[in-house]
């Protein structure tokens, strides 16, 4: 059943592939805008181990009933001995025109000056409007604090101390890249690689870039 839901959610979205020439155009467009953080998930390097998700849970004190991040194992092809998987990161897209911000009655859901969509815990009343409005289904209500939670690129736990998000540091395959969207590292990667962005109806442009990749894995290893 979980595979069916994921397949349906992915099927509803718009997938736009870009090449290096397109990324240079994006870079020129962004020069006049505010600084934005962005993340790259290189699916060709990701092995689906979910070490990033476990590190995120520990660092950000997520309960067992909720998660800021997960790597979905989506079967693409199947045979007797091996299955080809697409490892897809499920987390906040930090999208422009985020519906979670629009529906929040207290202003607890907001975007900071670096483009990170965040939750102000002291203002959240636990109404779950933002959770229902998120088309990606990547928010949850913490059963202990009764506050909405989601990926915020470790804004308080890591970024404020000068460290990248814990998922980036924990990934054993170096499948995650994080930084200012206009930084040389991010722009060089976008220039040199074919990538895509996944956007669902009702949400604005995401700030999560993805490089498509699939992996053949023996069934007993998954």
From Swiss-Prot:
Q: List the disulfide bonds.
A: none
Quote the record's binding site residues for [4Fe-4S] cluster 4. Answer: 104, 124, 127, 130
Show where the 4Fe-4S ferredoxin-type domain sits. 37-66, 83-114, 115-144
Does the record's keyword annotation contain Metal-binding? yes
Signal sequence, renumbered to the chain: 1-27
Gene Ontology molecular functions: 4 iron, 4 sulfur cluster binding; metal ion binding
CDD domains with a match to the protein in the record: PsrB (cd10551)
Q: Which UniProt keywords apply?
A: 4Fe-4S, Iron, Iron-sulfur, Metal-binding, Repeat, Signal
Q: Which residues bind [4Fe-4S] cluster 1?
A: 46, 49, 52, 171
Q: Which InterPro entries match?
A: 4Fe4S_Fe-S-bd, 4Fe4S_Fe_S_CS, ET_IronSulfur_Cluster-Binding
Q: Which residues bind [4Fe-4S] cluster 2?
A: 56, 151, 154, 167
Q: What is this protein called?
A: Uncharacterized ferredoxin-like protein YdhX
Entry PTM? Predicted to be exported by the Tat system. The position of the signal peptide cleavage has not been experimentally proven.
Family annotation (PANTHER family) = PROTEIN NRFC, PROTEIN NRFC HOMOLOG
- The residues listed in the UniProt record as binding [4Fe-4S] cluster 3, with positions renumbered to this chain, are 92, 95, 100, 134
The highest taxon in the source lineage is: Bacteria
């Amino acid at each position: 059943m979980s595979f069916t839901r994921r397949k349906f959610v992915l099927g509803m979205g718009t997938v736009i592939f870009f090449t290096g020439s397109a990324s240079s155009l994006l870079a020129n467009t962004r020069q006049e805008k505010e600084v934005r953080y962005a993340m790259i998930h290189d699916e060709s390097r990701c092995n689906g181990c979910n070490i990033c998700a476990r590190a995120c849970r520990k660092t950000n004190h997520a309960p067992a009933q909720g998660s800021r991040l997960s790597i979905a194992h989506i079967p693409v092809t199947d045979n007797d001995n091996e299955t080809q998987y697409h490892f897809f990161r499920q987390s906040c897209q930090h999208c422009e025109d985020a519906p979670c911000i629009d529906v929040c009655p207290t202003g607890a859901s907001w975007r900071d000056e670096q483009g990170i969509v965040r939750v102000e815990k002291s203002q959240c009343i636990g109404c779950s409007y933002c959770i229902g409005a998120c088309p990606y289904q990547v928010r949850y209500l913490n059963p202990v604090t009764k506050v909405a939670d989601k990926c915020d690129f470790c804004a308080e736990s890591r970024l404020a101390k000068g460290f990248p998000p814990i998922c980036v540091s924990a990934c054993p395959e170096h499948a995650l890249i994080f930084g200012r969207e206009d930084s040389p590292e991010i722009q060089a990667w976008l220039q040199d690689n074919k990538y895509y962005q996944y956007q669902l109806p009702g949400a604005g442009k995401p700030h999560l870039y993805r490089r498509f990749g699939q992996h053949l894995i023996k069934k007993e290893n998954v």
